[in-house]
């Protein structure tokens, strides 16, 4: 997993249903290539295979609930995420929380088969617990700010600062990214200045009238923070 990174979660928005998901992913891919930055997209499970097989940028699943394939009606197996071409997995989003035991098993399975693993957490202490599971990144997202347009980097910077401090101290190999209310390039820039290595966002990009233009704005700050090759 490369950093700094912009991860665009398409959730189950109507604006990202079917071929619309691919249109957003293509716009993200274009921006990633033009700016030379890392952008990943996380389509809904219905569009995961389509998007993963159509773009070169990383494509992440929004979640999973079983480790391996089998007789699990309406479930999502970690191994099948890899099989359809996705390269990563987001776990424990506040809209899809997991019990600790299940989260631990899913994260371990995903890492064992080579998937990037991002675990979401609502606060610094929970982020530290998530980091103990060995993901590539922890995304700290105060749930009360998600979808509000009130960026965590501006309204709760102390949450980011403390998360970065705790995780860096105890699990230096785990990267901290952040999300919740991120709407503008300025919000992204602020998050990076607070010590994160990227952002996880959704509505700002998905609901934009011009996906390319908005993603370009959101990704531009990554060029300043980009790590040398």
Swiss-Prot record:
UniProt binding sites for substrate: 9-11, 146, 181, 202-203
GO cellular component: cytosol
InterPro entries for this protein: Aldolase_TIM (IPR013785), TIM_sf (IPR035990), Triosephosphate_isomerase (IPR000652), Triosephosphate_isomerase_arc (IPR022891), Triosephosphate_isomerase_AS (IPR020861)
Source taxon at top rank: Archaea
SUPFAM superfamilies in the record: Triosephosphate isomerase (TIM) (SSF51351)
Keywords noted in UniProt: Cytoplasm, Gluconeogenesis, Glycolysis, Isomerase
Active site as annotated: 93, 141
EC number of the protein: 5.3.1.1
Catalyses which reaction(s): D-glyceraldehyde 3-phosphate = dihydroxyacetone phosphate
Main location: cytoplasm
Enzyme class: isomerase
Pathway: Carbohydrate biosynthesis; gluconeogenesis; Carbohydrate degradation; glycolysis; D-glyceraldehyde 3-phosphate from glycerone phosphate: step 1/1
GO process terms (BP): gluconeogenesis; glyceraldehyde-3-phosphate biosynthetic process; glycerol catabolic process; glycolytic process
A family per Pfam: TIM
Cellular localization per UniProt: Cytoplasm
PROSITE patterns named in the record: TIM_1 (PS00171), TIM_2 (PS51440)
A GO molecular-function annotation: triose-phosphate isomerase activity
Coiled-coil boundaries: none
HAMAP family: TIM_A
Function noted in UniProt: Involved in the gluconeogenesis. Catalyzes stereospecifically the conversion of dihydroxyacetone phosphate (DHAP) to D-glyceraldehyde-3-phosphate (G3P).
Oligomer status and interactors: Homotetramer; dimer of dimers.
Family indicated by similarity: Belongs to the triosephosphate isomerase family.
NCBIfam families xref list: PRK04302.1, tim
Protein name: Triosephosphate isomerase
Native source species: Pyrobaculum islandicum (strain DSM 4184 / JCM 9189 / GEO3)
Gene expressing this chain: tpiA
């Amino acid at each position: 997993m490369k950093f700094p990174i912009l991860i665009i979660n398409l959730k189950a928005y109507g604006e990202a249903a079917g071929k619309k998901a691919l249109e957003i992913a293509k716009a993200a891919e274009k921006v990633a290539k033009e700016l030379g930055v890392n952008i990943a997209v996380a389509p809904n499970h219905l569009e995961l295979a389509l998007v993963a097989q159509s773009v070169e940028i990383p494509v992440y699943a929004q979640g999973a609930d079983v480790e391996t394939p089998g007789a699990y009606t309406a479930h999502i197996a970690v191994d099948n995420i890899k099989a359809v071409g996705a390269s990563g997995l987001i776990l424990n989003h506040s809209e899809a929380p997991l019990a600790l035991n299940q989260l631990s098993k899913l994260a371990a399975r995903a890492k064992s088969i080579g998937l990037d693993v991002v675990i979401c957490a609502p606060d610094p202490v929970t982020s530290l617990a998530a980091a103990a599971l060995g993901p590539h990144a922890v995304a700290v997202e105060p749930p009360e700010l998600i979808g509000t347009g009130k960026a965590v980097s501006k309204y709760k910077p102390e949450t980011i600062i403390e998360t970065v401090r705790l995780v860096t101290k105890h699990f230096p190999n785990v990267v901290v990214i952040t999300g919740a209310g991120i709407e503008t390039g300025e919000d992204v820039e602020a998050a990076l200045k607070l010590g994160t290595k990227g952002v996880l966002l959704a509505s700002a990009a998905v609901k934009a009238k011009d996906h390319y233009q908005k993603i370009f704005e959101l990704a531009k700050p990554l060029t300043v923070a980009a790590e040398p090759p």
